[in-house]
Amino acid sequence: PVSVKTRLGYETPEEFAALLDIYNRYPIACLTIHPRVRKEKYRGPVHLDAFAAALEASRNPVCYNGDLRTVGEVCALEARFPSVTHVMIGRGLVADPALARKLRGGAGTNRKELSDFLAALYQGYTDFYQGQVPTAAQRMREVWFYLIHLFDDAEKLNKQLRRFRTPAEYERIQAEILAACPLRSDAQGDLI
């Protein structure tokens, strides 16, 4: 089976009709649609009306991908598009590593779980980059771009995260966030 991930087009959502004509010629196991065009990258609102039209016209099963960060957002999507049985979540899982568990009715995250997750991820990056700790720390900066929203009162430390120069600085800032910044109550539940 072949799956395809696509956007609505390069310049405008109207380009998708021609793309869908091509996709509909083949037995695709799952057509994952990110309802933005390429030039929008990840900015601006998703084009849900264009997604609705694509969903109706597709001959293949459709998976939704784009801006799903909370249980509430996934539930709203399911309510609006009940025929969508699959979703793809990317940055939403980086922003809330417990999101998949919460979608299955489980608990949100806690400070220890986040600390363990971040330590394992940092070590994984260090191993992957063959001991290049500065490179691993830079990768962690990218993770924190999304993850910082789980914490209250973290604005000052978030600025430091964006500007650190050494792995030791990164490690100090992360430790301070985990020790001093309150975990948002909705991080422990849902980010609605």
Language-model regions, residue ranges each:
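Active-site glycine- and acidic-residue-rich loops that bind
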Residues: P1-A18, L68-T70
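Alpha/beta catalytic cores of nucleotide-metabolism and tRNA/nucleoside-modifying enzymes
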Residues: F16-C30, Y42, D49, A53-Y64, ...
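Short, small-residue-enriched loops and turns at beta-alpha junctions
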Residues: L8-T12, V37-G44
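Short, flexible active-site loops
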Residues: R36-V37, R104
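A cross-family glycoside hydrolase active-site/sugar-binding cleft signature
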Residues: S3-R7, T32-H34, C63-N65
